[in-house]
């Protein structure tokens, strides 16, 4: 049997989800909405491509914004 030639896999570098100048804050609603699902749930770290520290800070910021009624707890737009 012939062996297939080994192809080099190009590593696609993804852009970081949070740019260096952006600050995770409960008042930054545009940033927070990027990490919520359509139903209003917080997306997982694996889906968001965040570090553990960033995910914890993001979760706290989202919860603070929900308590202050800046973003809804659930999106029930039917």
Curated annotation (Swiss-Prot):
Annotated family: Belongs to the bacterial ribosomal protein bS18 family.
Keywords: Chloroplast, Plastid, Ribonucleoprotein, Ribosomal protein, RNA-binding, rRNA-binding
Residue segments, region Disordered: 1-20
Summary of subunit composition and partner proteins: Part of the 30S ribosomal subunit.
One GO biological process term: translation
Name of the protein: Small ribosomal subunit protein bS18c
Basic residues: bias regions: 1-16
Lineage of the species this protein comes from: Eukaryota, Viridiplantae, Streptophyta, Charophyceae, Charales
GO cellular component: chloroplast; mitochondrial small ribosomal subunit
GO molecular function, a single term: small ribosomal subunit rRNA binding
InterPro entries per record: Ribosomal_bS18 (IPR001648), Ribosomal_bS18_CS (IPR018275), Ribosomal_bS18_sf (IPR036870)
Coiled-coil features, chain-numbered ranges: none
Localization terms from the record: Plastid, Chloroplast
Residue intervals passing through the bilayer: none
PROSITE patterns on file: RIBOSOMAL_S18
């Amino acid at each position: 049997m012939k062996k297939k030639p080994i192809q080099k896999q190009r590593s696609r570098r993804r852009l970081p989800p949070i740019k260096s100048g952006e600050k995770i804050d409960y008042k930054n609603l545009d940033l927070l909405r990027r990490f919520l699902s359509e139903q209003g749930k917080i997306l997982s770290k694996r889906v968001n491509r965040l570090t553990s520290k960033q995910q914890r800070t993001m979760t706290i910021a989202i919860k603070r914004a929900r308590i202050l009624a800046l973003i809804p707890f659930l999106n029930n737009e039917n």
